[in-house]
Structure formats: C-alpha cells, structure tokens
C-alpha cells in the first residue's frame, strides 16, 4: 500500500485524520487504513494536560485500541457508535476504547489498579445505532496482544476473519472478510504482502472518513454523572472537603466538582 494522500478536509481545533476504506476485487475483502500520528499526538497531549501517567506496558495496547476501533468504526454504518472494554488477565489491565461515526470522535482509557483477578481475557463490545436498542457481545480470549484479541472477537462474534498489520509505527491496516471472501488468501497475508497490496490486488476506494481524538466530557456532564451518587452519600463523597476530583470514565480527564455545584444541580426540579 502506498502512503495515504494528504488530508483534504478543512483544519479544525482538534487534529483529525482521514481513514480510507477499499474493496479488494477478486478477493472480496474490505481494507481500512489510517495514519494515526495526529490522533496519537492528541492523545499524548490529553494525557499531559490531565496528568495521566501511563505505564510503559500500557503504551502498545492503548495505541492498538485507538487505531483498531477507528478502523473498525470506519467499516461500519454511519449511524453507529461502538465501545470496547477489553480485560487482560496478566498483566491485569482493562482497556476501554470508543468511536462514534456521527461525531467522528475516538477516545480511550485504561485501568491497572483496583482490578479483580480474572482467569482469561474478556472482550466486551457495545454497539448503539440510531434508535435501535443497544447491543452487547462478550467473547473470551487468551491472546496477549490487543490486535490479536480484536481478531478473536471478529472470529467469534462477527463470524468472519480479520487481520491487522502495522504498515509503519503509526500506520495501521485492517483487512476484513466480506461475503465469498478468499479466506485462504486473507489468512496467508504477511507484513511484506501488505506493502505491495495495492499492486497485487485491484482496490476500489469506498469511502473517506474523518476521525478526531475527542471525548466531549465537561463540567456539566460530570455533574450529571455524579449527581446520583451525591444524592445517596454526599458526606461520604466529600469527607468535609469543599470539592472533589473526578476522573472521566471514558477518557480519564480530571474534573474538579464543588459540593455547592452538586447541591445546586440536585436541587433543580426534574422538569428543568
């Protein structure tokens, strides 16, 4: 595959990337590709802004989570939003990633402390599409790599083969089986064959989509998030302090909430 073309969209306040999807003629496979350098840089700055320290062992799984869920989302319907929670047993680690086609947003978070031991990896996939009821799939796995765990999820839940390949440090390629796919060809793909894929296979461009690392959490949303807890156990929550620090469960951003603000929020009539 040759390098992706320069981004053609107008610049925004958040760095965005372009993901392209192709159809491999004669092989009946969908190919999605993106250069994630801008999103990885935005994720790094997000961590610096909020004092989020990431263990060295977390760097690769988190990057793989951000990139793979973005490519997965780019291959899905426009009205669909998806979220993955992936639990690794050893080392004990939870990785969360979400992507929304409607907003073009991608986020990720992780947890390494206060986790119960588990015997095998667990992959939870949640999907929301327009007004349809949310759907959840749960798959167990034994792989150590996040990308291999996604491949197991596709095999067991989606009932089709998918492969992931890094084309560079920040350039990921996904090849997913479609109906009547040449699965022997797909299973036999290697790092070297990915480099010449556009010369060996006829590729037809399907779509271009834009994605940005952005959560959307803010003070108002965190007040709504914490209000039910405050109503049940306000004193236990604050321990006499005028404010508390709350982490967004989706992106790990730190928000300072005052008792006064929560009291004002919970005292509002329900119709307001």
Task: Label each residue range with its predicted role.
Residues 2-206:
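Interaction interfaces in information-processing and related assembly proteins
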